[in-house]
Amino acid sequence: MLKKTGIKIVIVPAAVLLVLICGTCEAYILRGPYLLDRMTRKLDGIQSMLVTQQVQFLDADENGSSQAEETLRYLFPQSFRSDARSEESQRIHVVDHGRSMTVINGKRVGGDETVFDIYKEILLFRSRERLNDRLIDSGIDMSVVAYGRFEDKIAFVIGAEKPDDPVPRLWIDKETFLPMRWLVKKKSAEADPVWVEIRYADWRRIDHAWYPMQITYLQDGEPIREIRVDSLKTNLTFPQELFDVEHLKEKYAALLPEDKAGPVSGELNEIEQSIDEFRKKYE
């Protein structure tokens, strides 16, 4: 009788301990806002940055350019400018304190950012709160975090209960707290959503901050764009007018004047066609 009772005493605490361990495993996964705080600290430490890079359009057709040279100017944490040049076209994209504008071949074509512009937002925003709001806007549930494995590295997966759940999510390296993958839904006329994945790789430390030397875009699992950094310079002084949206509006005319209606033809139509071709690479 004593032996039987002794067995029960050993088994019951073990079962209770197992329940307690399983019930508290979830608590040891760090929460989204804290992870963003750790990540932004790793990226912070400089005032400005000049980046020169090569962009490969892996999905380009035979008639279009397959690459572009691009210069980025970061004025942390609010301003950004991209100047891209291919064989046929030039594109300027500016973001300043929440306002944006795009110029293609010297003509203003609107200010909306495309999915191919957003990779820089994780690198630009140095405020946990601003980045938190931006990720929520992209569809990520910041209250949910899981563990995942990617390329033999353990990662925190913000936005998913399981790492491969078909939801927008951000992967952060568990050891370095640097972003690895950002998965978003791209706007599409198709019934099924188009998934775009942004991968950040080959991180290098420059001064007191980190920057990825390679960024790859995948659409439905297939690589469609690759960015490779040629050079980085930090803490430079940029002319403020480079980021001044109002100044740029005065400098560059709209593709079509606001008071002009009706079809376009001749030279203007050719300009519009070249703009549309270059635009497709960024939409």
Explain the meaning of each model-derived region:
Residues 56, 77, 85-87, 97-100, ...:
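Solvent-exposed coil/turn segments that connect beta secondary-structure elements
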Residues 63-67, 79, 122-123, 190-193, ...:
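Subset-of-secretome marker
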Residues 245-283:
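Gram-negative outer-membrane assembly/targeting C-terminal domains
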Residues 23-107, 141-143:
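N-terminal mature ectodomain segment of secretory-pathway/periplasmic proteins
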Residues 2-13:
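Bacterial N-terminal signal peptides that target proteins for export
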Residues 27-35, 41-45, 99-169, 174, ...:
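Flexible, processing/modification-adjacent segments and terminal tails
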